[in-house]
């Protein structure tokens, strides 16, 4: 049976804008997904040491029903600071939850541990978050750059036997359309184990 799914770029998913901030020299960065009109979110936080911000807001029992951005970042827990820059830039553009005198952008964030890859003293900060939002909203890429960019700049895999055995990973994205329905995913792959092709076993 012929598939009805059409492969598209994640930037073609309506209602979302994407931007990267990359610090090649320090080996870290952040990626932002902006929903200017807000989007309904959900959350499933896993792992033994998650570095996350505002993810509990997405639980169904809570009152906030829209998220305005998701920030993926390097820098471990320090990288959560990038989300403050995302929120600051969105507020300056009037994007967020109206609360009377201003808008409060709902920015959820999660970070990977990449401090062992590049310069551990440099982490995505407020300015990095601002730059990523400006890339998303002012330049509006038609294709999301993938690989060693954004939140995937310092990502590695194969660390189970220690740093000496690891290899480079990065930022990946995929999207499909089924008629008018579009679904996309963006991920910074920073696994402890190896990435294996299920078709070749390599």
Question: Model-predicted segments: where are they?
Answer:
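Alpha/propeptide regions of enzymes that mature by internal proteolysis
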Residues: 1-202
């Amino acid at each position: 049976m012929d598939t009805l799914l059409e492969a598209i770029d994640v930037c073609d998913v309506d209602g979302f804008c994407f931007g990267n901030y990359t610090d090649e020299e320090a080996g870290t960065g952040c990626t932002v997904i902006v929903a200017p009109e807000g989007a309904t979110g959900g959350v499933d936080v896993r792992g033994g040491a998650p570095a996350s911000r505002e993810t509990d807001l997405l639980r169904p029992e809570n009152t906030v029903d829209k998220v305005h951005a998701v920030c993926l970042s390097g820098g471990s827990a320090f990288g959560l600071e990038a989300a403050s820059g995302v929120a600051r830039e969105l507020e300056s553009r009037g994007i967020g939850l109206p609360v009377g005198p201003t808008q409060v952008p709902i920015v959820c964030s999660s970070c990977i541990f990449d401090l062992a890859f590049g310069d551990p003293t440099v982490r995505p900060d407020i300015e990095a978050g601002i730059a990523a939002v400006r890339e998303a909203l002012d330049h509006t890429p038609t294709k999301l750059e993938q690989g060693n960019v954004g939140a995937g700049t310092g990502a590695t895999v194969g660390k189970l036997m220690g740093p000496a055995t690891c290899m480079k990973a990065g930022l990946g994205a995929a999207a499909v359309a089924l008629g008018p329905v579009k679904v996309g995913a963006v991920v910074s792959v920073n696994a402890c184990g190896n990435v294996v092709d299920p078709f070749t076993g390599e």
